[in-house]
Structures are given as C-alpha cells and as structure tokens.
Amino acid sequence: MSGEDGPAAGPGAAAAAARERRREQLRQWGARAGAEPGPGERRARTVRFERAAEFLAACAGGDLDEARLMLRAADPGPGAELDPAAPPPARAVLDSTNADGISALHQACIDENLEVVRFLVEQGATVNQADNEGWTPLHVAASCGYLDIARYLLSHGANIAAVNSDGDLPLDLAESDAMEGLLKAEIARRGVDVEAAKRAEEELLLHDTRCWLNGGAMPEARHPRTGASALHVAAAKGYIEVMRLLLQAGYDPELRDGDGWTPLHAAAHWGVEDACRLLAEHGGGMDSLTHAGQRPCDLADEEVLSLLEELARKQEDLRNQKEASQSRGQEPQAPSSSKHRRSSVCRLSSREKISLQDLSKERRPGGAGGPPIQDEDEGEEGPTEPPPAEPRTLNGVSSPPHPSPKSPVQLEEAPFSRRFGLLKTGSSGALGPPERRTAEGAPGAGLQRSASSSWLEGTSTQAKELRLARITPTPSPKLPEPSVLSEVTKPPPCLENSSPPSRIPEPESPAKPNVPTASTAPPADSRDRRRSYQMPVRDEESESQRKARSRLMRQSRRSTQGVTLTDLKEAEKAAGKAPESEKPAQSLDPSRRPRVPGVENSDSPAQRAEAPDGQGPGPQAAREHRKVGKEWRGPAEGEEAEPADRSQESSTLEGGPSARRQRWQRDLNPEPEPESEEPDGGFRTLYAELRRENERLREALTETTLRLAQLKVELERATQRQERFAERPALLELERFERRALERKAAELEEELKALSDLRADNQRLKDENAALIRVISKLSK
C-alpha cells in the first residue's frame, strides 16, 4: 500500500511546488512595481486656439465675463518688463482681427450689440480701426443704419471724415434719412470739408513723392502685410499725377506685391482706365502673371476689358516696329570713301537707278586712277583738285558725290553752279581718256541744253568729248559735236559752214509748248559744261541745318528752272555776240516745266540774220531741229544703238544742204516725245492719278457708308416686321383664348340669369305662401 501511495504523491507535490514558485515570482514583481514611481494619471487632450480668436469668439457670443478674464490674463502685471515699441498685451487683444481685418468692435457693430460696443470702448479699443477694405466701425454702423451705435461712436471720438478703399465716407454709405441727417449735422458741427477729406490720401502721396524726388532717393516702401508699393496704391485708386511722378522718377512699372500683382493688375481690377493707359505707355506688361497665373485681362473689370485688349495690340505693334527698326539699323552699310552726309535721298525712277548701277560698275575699275577733272572756271585759276571719291550708294543705287557747300561760288558767273551737285548722274561720270581732255577756257562758249529744257550752245572740244562710255565719237571736219551729259537731252548745234555756232530759234508749238526731258535737275551754267568731281569736304553743319538746306534746295530746284536773261547774255558774251539783239526775257510760264517764251520767238530779225545760209528760221527748221535733237536723245535709253545713229547723223550732216532739206521734208511730222521720259512730269501725272483715285475711292467709301446705313435701317425694319409676324400667331392664340374665356363667362352669366329668374319665381311663391299662412294664422287666432 505504501509503495503505491509514493508515486501518486510525487506528481501532486511537484505541481504544488510549481504553483508556489509562480506565486513567489508574482509577489516579488509586485513589490518591485510598487517601489518604482508610476506614470501617473494621463491628462485629457485639449485644443487651444489663439488668444485673439478666443477673444473674438467671446465678444461675438456676448460672453463679457470670459472677455474680461482674457484681458486680465493678458495683462502682465505691474512688475513685468514690456517692449516700449509694442502695444500693451491687453490692447493687442482688444484690437485683434481675423483674416479680413474685422475686429471685435466691427463685429459688435455688425451684430448691433450696443452692450459689447460699450464694453470694448470702455476697455480701450481703437474706435477708428479700419479693416482690409478701409471700413471703420462708424462705416459699419452707418451702412447698417444703427443710430444708437453711431451716436455712441461719434461721442467717443469716431472720425467722421474717414475714407475707405472705395473713397467713401460714412455719409456716403448712410442708408436711412435719419442716419444721413445725423452724420450731416456732425459734419457741420465739426466743420469737415468732404472733398478735401476724400483727397487727403492723394495729397499725402503726392507730397511724399515730391519729397522723395527732391531728396534724390526713392525708398522701397512696401505695405508690411500685402507688400504693395506706392505705385500699386496710386494705380488702384486712380492717382494719375502721383503715378506720373513715380514713373518719371524711375519707378519700375513691373513691381509685384505679395500675391504677384503688378500695378497694372491693380488698375485693371479696380477699373481705372487712365492708370491702365499710363502704365501701358511706360512698359507695363500685358502678359505679366500673378502667383496664381492670372494676367491683367483675367482680373480686369468688364468696363476696361476692351481697353486692355486695345493697349495690348498697340504694345505689340510698337514692339514689332522697334524690332524692325533695330534690324534695319543693324544692316551693313556700303563702304564709301566720302564721309560727307547726304542732304536728301535722290528721287530716281527705276530706269534711272538701273543706269546708275551700270555706270557705277563701269566706273569702279578706273574711276580713281585718272587725273581729276576741273571746271572751266577753276581750270584757268585754281590748282588741280583731288581725285573724285566713289559715289555713295543707297540700297544698291549709286548716287552722285555731293559738292562741298564751302567751295566758293560766284553767283554772277555761274548762277546755277550752286545746285550743280543735284544733277542726276547718268553718263557724265564716264569720261574719256586723259589725252582727250584739252585746255579749257576756249572762246566761243555757248549755251548747253540743261535738264529743264533750256538751250545752251557747245563751244569747245572738251564739250564734244563728254560722252557715254560706250560711244565712239565721229569726228566732223566742219561741225562741232554736241556734248552729252548724264541723260540730259539737247539738240545738236546749229548747222553752219564757217560762222561761229549760233542757236536756231524754235517756234512755240501750241500742241507741245515744253519739250520734255529725262531730268528734273536745274539748268547748268553756261560755263559749267562739265561736273566737278572734286573730293567732297565734310560738312560740319548740324542735322537741323542740313535738313533745312536740303529743303531749300528742293524748293529752289522746283521754282527756278528755266533760262533767264542773265544766262542768255552770258551765252552771247561767250559766243562773241552783242546782247542788243536779244529781247528782254518774258515772265516764266506758270507750268510745271518753265520755259522762256521770248527765247523761242522765231520772228526776231536779228535771229533771222544770224541764221546760216539757206537755213532760214521757220516751222520746217524748228521741226528738223527737234527731230535731230530727238535722235540725239534716243540712244540715251539704250547705249548699244548709239554708234550707228551717230555715224548716220554725221553722214547726214556732211551731205550738205540738199541732204538736210530732204531729211527735213521727210520728217515734217515728227512723232511727239513720250511724256514718260520726264520723271517730274511722270511724278506729277502719277500724283494726279493717285489723287483722282483717292477721290474716287473716298466717294465710293462715302456711298458705301450711306448704303450700309440704309441697309442697316432696312434690316432693322425687316427684323421688326419679322418679329411682329413671329409674334402674330401668339397674339392670335391669345385672342382666341380670351374669346373662349369670355364666351364661357357669358354662358355662365346666362346660366346665372336663368337661375336668378327661377329664384325670383320661388321667392315670389314663398312670399305668397307666407301671406296665406299669415292670414290662416290670423283667422285661427281669432
């Protein structure tokens, strides 16, 4: 029995021992946990707002006790050290605002809570504190019509002249007559100038800006919260004079505030048109983006949206013009050895430009190597001139070198030599070889044919040698050859045997009074048969003087063309003839191409005596003279055919009087010269055509405008008729509906009338029955 109990008691004792050990461990752990300090009780989490938000919430809820506790808690006490620059903590709590700048006093006025208003004012709140839009508590009370709050604020020093951001006083926001009367009475009592109060901010800004300009420094004054500059404020409120001063002082029109707004954004948002124009003129960007990616057009008021679009187009046009001018200014200029500035741009036709280009190409290889050419007057007295410079080029067109304005010019000897540099250079630059240039000053100098259809006579061998570069002169043993200048057409000298050259008089033709030429330059002097190719001297005159001189030259060039009496006398002196035979020159023809009628008179006996043998003056001689002159002028258009014409002319001249008479008889009716050879006349004709075309277009535009107005009126009438026609079915339907309603109403009234007659009959029957009953009752009562 004892043996069986032993094994059974062993497992039970082991389990008990294990439990005892576990119990001991728990006891020891509890002892250690009790000895160590515990974490304590966990505090509940709370949400704390800013003191300003809590104070605003307490005042909005009317909890004045809580507001007093907050103000008392904000007071640091008598011994605390305070920052002198910062407001007291209690005052900061009283004037605390929300995101819109609304303080507790603003909110109390909005809620019409006079008790909270009194509490805040008694505690020291700022009565004239403005929100983000510039509204004071008095603005709020006036706008809401709270008379009691307005009186209380006025009695405690509220500013009745305060102006908000829109430029409004509390009086401007008054809604009721009682409020308006209260504010007007207060304004009269205080003597406030309403207009001056509205201009006070602008005057202050203007004064500060002038002080900045006088001081020479422009401070970067910015709003501490919004970052707006003075230009932002002036643009938003339309202070144009302040903006002009700021922009003239160098204020950047692209300044940005805290939101990335430029002054143009502000002006567009508030709809200030003048400010938008001024900023756009000073480079305000129409495509400037804010931090939100908005342009001025995106923020603009509807009234200024069209203006901004127009300003954007103008800025784009100005930008394109500036880029085009810069690109033109960067084009390479053709090199020129002459540094003299051109006084004006040559007005040449396309044909003349091509001839000038060809001439400049032919002149370049040997133009600078040959000896210089002098004028006849200068060749006798003055020294050798320096070699000519290369002609200046403008857009690929060679232009003649400009003579120096400082060179001495004698008006008595050469009346038109002052303007000789204005002659067009067609072929006069291509000179013959040096050995062909003979001594100047030969006797017998005559008049040459100038650019204005004047007659000049050739007198020396030098005049014969001045020809186009491709012309080979045909020597004539008897007759001098006519000189050919640059596209200047002239007739050959008079046909004579041994006498000095004389001029064949030309009768005045009624169909063609003026012989057209290919040049518009003034006539050359009788002695200046060739151009002076001297080196131009640099002109030191100013730009304005140069332009004025060029204008005078152009005017004189138009008004002094023709041959005067002085030219004729000098030509006669040079030819050795007496001036007694010449008649006084008549007044110039008032046409575009002037001429001297006295010179063309062919009835003079002196001129008839001067004519060579067998060649008396008459219509045939004049026509032959013009024909020969036209043949001489013909090769000026194409230089290839000139040698053959020259040789043919020489053979004709050498044939004697009979050949000349046959030629005259064959060419009695020469073809008129085309007026297209005369650039000046062509310009005049073109101008007249353009003017007529403009008049025609203007009349057409006027007619079109009137027609458009008539069509608009007709369209409006048609639209009105269509609207009436469109509304007519609706009107008919409405009338039909009303008719049916009236019919129904009439039927109802008829039914009512029938019922009324029945009711009357019933009523009468009841009356009769009632009378019968009354009689029965009266009988029964007896």
UniProtKB/Swiss-Prot annotation:
Where, by tissue, is this protein expressed? Ubiquitously expressed. Highly expressed in heart.
Keyword Transmembrane listed? no
Composition bias of kind Basic residues appears in 547-557
List, as start-end ranges, the regions of compositional bias called Basic and acidic residues.
349-365, 537-546, 567-583
In the record for this protein, the ANK repeats are positioned at 100-129, 133-162, 226-255, 259-288
Where in this protein does the record say N-acetylserine is found?
A: 2
Q: Does the keyword Coiled coil apply?
A: yes
User: Where would one find coiled-coil regions in this protein?
Assistant: 297-329, 681-782
Main localization (coarse):
cytoplasm
The subcellular location is: Cytoplasm; Cytoplasm, Cytoskeleton, Stress fiber
Q: Which Pfam families match?
A: Ank_2, PRKG1_interact
Its keywords, alphabetically, are: Acetylation, ANK repeat, Coiled coil, Cytoplasm, Cytoskeleton, Phosphoprotein, Repeat
Q: Where is the composition biased (Low complexity)?
A: 1-17
Q: Which GO terms describe its biological process?
A: neuron projection morphogenesis; signal transduction
Point to the regions of Acidic residues compositional bias: 374-383, 670-680
Q: How is it modified after translation?
A: Phosphorylation at Thr-560 is essential for its interaction with PPP1CB.
**Which positions bear Phosphothreonine?**
560
Identification of the protein by name: Protein phosphatase 1 regulatory subunit 12C
